[in-house]
């Protein structure tokens, strides 16, 4: 993951931070709190990481696994048969964690659906990076004026994820097709 900045501010113009590789999502993972970070019937996993001295450190409750309702998956109401109404609820398994890197908290959510679909959602939260606003330095289109005295730089969070699909054996392939009119 890389975070390039598009600001003219001397505090930010030089930045192109590699949050995921320079700091590491794994090493910056938070312990999750019951009832706040995950809801429902929850199973937590601890994570283990190497410390700078080579010892092993444990992050308790680093990964949350739970199941949640995801609406109607299938429904049929047959008007030719009185009272025939079938509904199947959709469920998804959620595997999630949070990592704090600098002023950002990244929530990483993997969703596993009953139809085999796998979805990744990354939620960004935290504290806005700011600098003192000055009309000669901060330009529209490069910085946001968030108050009369403060500016925040325009930047992006670009993620790239690789999944190793060696399920059952190494001969499996995955194809994605995008159809446009």
Language-model features, listed with the residues they occupy:
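Beta-strand/loop-rich accessory regions of lumenal/periplasmic or secreted enzymes
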Residues: 1-181
């Amino acid at each position: 993951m890389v975070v390039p900045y598009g600001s003219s501010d001397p505090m930010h113009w030089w930045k192109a931070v590699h949050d995921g590789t320079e700091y590491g999502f794994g090493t910056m993972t938070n312990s999750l709190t019951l009832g706040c970070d995950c809801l429902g019937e929850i199973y937590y996993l601890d994570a283990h990481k190497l410390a700078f001295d080579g010892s092993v450190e444990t992050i308790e409750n680093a990964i949350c696994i739970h199941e949640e309702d995801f609406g109607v998956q299938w429904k049929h109401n047959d008007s030719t048969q009185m009272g025939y109404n079938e509904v199947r609820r959709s469920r998804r398994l959620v595997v999630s964690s949070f990592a704090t890197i600098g002023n950002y908290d990244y929530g990483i959510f993997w969703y596993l659906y009953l139809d085999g679909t796998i979805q990744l959602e990354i939620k960004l939260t935290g504290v806005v990076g700011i600098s003192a606003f000055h009309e000669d330095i901060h330009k529209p289109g490069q910085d946001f004026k968030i108050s009369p005295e403060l500016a925040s730089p325009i930047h992006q969070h670009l993620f790239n994820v690789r999944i190793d699909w060696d399920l059952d054996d190494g001969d499996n392939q995955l194809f994605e097709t995008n159809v446009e009119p």
